[in-house]
């Protein structure tokens, strides 16, 4: 049963109804409709914290989805779930894959920077300043890319870049 049919939230039900109407009236292929249905169900499961179900839906959505832009958001959301699960290597992989298809995802650059910064902090706690510096430098590069795409955002990252003298 489609997740939209079992969700009891009024707003989710309304959104599902609107999405289903749009799917019927907008000319799309059956593959696009299938991908959207899986994507929508994945987002619903993700918003409820049902990450395993969300991942299953997102993976299913990648099969029929051929549009690089739409596919980038599916891959980005897979990265989000892996980040939430503490699977940072997998998360980075999916953020990279999303950016290959859509290089204008500042949130992917930001999330990659956050992971790199976190790894840098871990290296500091372990007493490995050389590794910490490498991770911090990588975080800086990703934050610079995110900021370049959306200059008014990521103020904390901008401050960190200035404090650590990595902002040019």
Swiss-Prot record:
SUPFAM superfamilies reported for this sequence: TPR-like
UniProtKB keywords: Chloroplast, Membrane, Photosynthesis, Plastid, Repeat, Thylakoid, TPR repeat
InterPro entries: PSI_Ycf3_assembly, TPR-like_helical_dom_sf, TPR_rpt, Ycf3/AcsC/BcsC/TPR_MFPF
GO biological process, one term: photosynthesis
Pfam family membership, one: TPR_1
Subcellular location: Plastid, Chloroplast thylakoid membrane
GO CC annotation, single: chloroplast thylakoid membrane
Protein's membrane topology: Peripheral membrane protein
TPR repeat positions: 35-68, 72-105, 120-153
Chief location of this protein within or outside the cell: plastid
Origin superkingdom: Eukaryota
Function: Essential for the assembly of the photosystem I (PSI) complex. May act as a chaperone-like factor to guide the assembly of the PSI subunits.
Family: Belongs to the Ycf3 family.
The name this protein goes by in its record: Photosystem I assembly protein Ycf3
Organism classification: Eukaryota, Viridiplantae, Streptophyta, Embryophyta, Tracheophyta
């Amino acid at each position: 049963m489609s997740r939209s049919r079992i969700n009891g939230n009024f707003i989710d039900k309304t959104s599902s109804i609107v999405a289903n109407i749009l799917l019927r009236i907008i000319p799309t292929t059956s593959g696009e409709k299938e991908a959207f249905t899986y994507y929508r169900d994945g987002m619903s499961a993700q918003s409820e914290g049902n990450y395993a179900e969300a991942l299953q839906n997102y993976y299913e959505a990648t099969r029929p989805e051929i549009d690089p832009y739409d596919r980038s958001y599916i891959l980005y959301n897979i990265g989000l779930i892996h980040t939430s699960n503490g699977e940072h290597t997998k998360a980075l992989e999916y953020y990279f894959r999303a950016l290959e298809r859509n290089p204008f995802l500042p949130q992917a650059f930001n999330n990659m920077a956050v992971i790199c910064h976190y790894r840098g902090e871990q290296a500091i706690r372990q007493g490995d300043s050389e590794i910490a510096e490498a991770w911090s430098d990588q975080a800086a590069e990703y934050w610079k890319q995110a900021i370049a795409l959306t200059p008014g955002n990521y103020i904390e990252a901008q401050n960190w870049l200035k404090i650590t003298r990595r902002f040019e």
